[in-house]
Curated annotation (Swiss-Prot):
It comes from Gallus gallus. Belongs to the Mediator complex subunit 20 family. It comes from the Eukaryota. Keywords: Activator, Nucleus, Transcription, Transcription regulation. PANTHER family: MEDIATOR OF RNA POLYMERASE II TRANSCRIPTION SUBUNIT 20, UBIQUITIN SPECIFIC PROTEASE HOMOLOG 49. The gene is MED20. This is Mediator of RNA polymerase II transcription subunit 20.
Amino acid sequence: MGVTCVTQVPVLEGKSVQQTVELLSKKLELLGAEKHGAFGVDCETYHTAAAISSQGQTGKLMYVMHNSEYPLSCFALFENGPCLIADANFDTLMVKLKGFFQNAKANKIESRGTRYQYCDFLVKVGTVTMGPSARGISVEVEYCPCVIANDCWNLLMEFMQSFMGSHTPGIPSVFGTKHDSIYSPADTMVQYMELFNKIRKQQQVPVAGIR
């Protein structure tokens, strides 16, 4: 894999989530991007079991995530902590750990949509949902030939501006910790975790935007 930026795109004023996704997709196709299948990223939240919290320890959250790009892996991200990469049956282990972590089932969130290939870029435009309702839009852009974030951020930003306009993001926080080290799949999952947490907290407010 290369270096990836994950961001949220606001819903356009007077448009639905689906209509905004379609407009973004149309802009990509006009640039010459071609559809390359579908993708999905999901996240379930686990919190420290009540028995542990009652002992005076501060409650902690853990996010268990899956990404269709890595079908044999499961990612466990601790709140303000490390990212553990395990095999796909990690979910089964979490059931056995219910004395320590409990699943906050109402908080499951996921992004699903279409993958696009444009030259050396892989773009994923997804609808973020919680339960039956669409809560927002995610855009993931990967520059495939590079593995050092600092070496290609300007190129990533320039490409994102071509179809996102003024909604092009700033540098992701995870880039600040990488400096000149090699980018990894865990860095992408951290960005999705941050995006999902942001969307969980916000009301859907349409804005003027992509033209």
